[in-house]
């Protein structure tokens, strides 16, 4: 059976929370971890994903999340839901000389499709008069 053609892209929300290792790390270590975090997500782009937007909840929270589990978010367009395991695997992989990112961040994803009618209604350019 051939895959179903979809007139819309898959979307993925990434929810992240800081772990103790991040909160307690000296700035030099945080800089290394942040560079590794960016590199991991650059790998997502190489797999066909596109970053749409990000949000850091630092206005309402300092340190690790307590009432909520998450304090930073990103929204991605992804080629297929089946890719999510491959996207998250670098965060939990143990390798010599590679920073294990799940020590510093907890990550969860939500995958779905856009609400096309809402996007068409609100993102369409205004009609000229």
Model-derived features with residue positions:
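Short S/T/G/P-rich N-terminal loop/turn motif that feeds into the first structured element of a domain
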Residues: 1-70, 78-84, 110-129
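Conserved, mostly hydrophobic/aromatic
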Residues: 74
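A common structural junction motif
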Residues: 91-102
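A short, structured active-site edge motif that brings together acidic residues
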Residues: 103-111
């Amino acid at each position: 059976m051939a895959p179903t053609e979809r007139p819309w892209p898959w979307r993925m929300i990434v929810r992240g929370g800081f772990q103790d290792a991040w909160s307690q790390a000296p700035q030099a270590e945080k800089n290394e971890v942040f560079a590794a975090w960016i590199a991991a997500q650059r790998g997502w782009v190489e797999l066909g994903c596109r970053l749409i937007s990000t949000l850091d909840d630092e206005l309402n929270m300092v340190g690790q999340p307590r009432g909520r589990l998450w304090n930073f978010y990103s929204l991605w367009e992804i080629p297929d839901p089946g890719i999510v395991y491959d996207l998250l695997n670098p965060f939990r992989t143990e390798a010599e000389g590679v920073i294990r990112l799940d020590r510093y961040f907890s990550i969860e994803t939500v995958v779905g499709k856009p609400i096309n009618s809402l996007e068409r209604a609100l993102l369409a350019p205004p009609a000229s008069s």
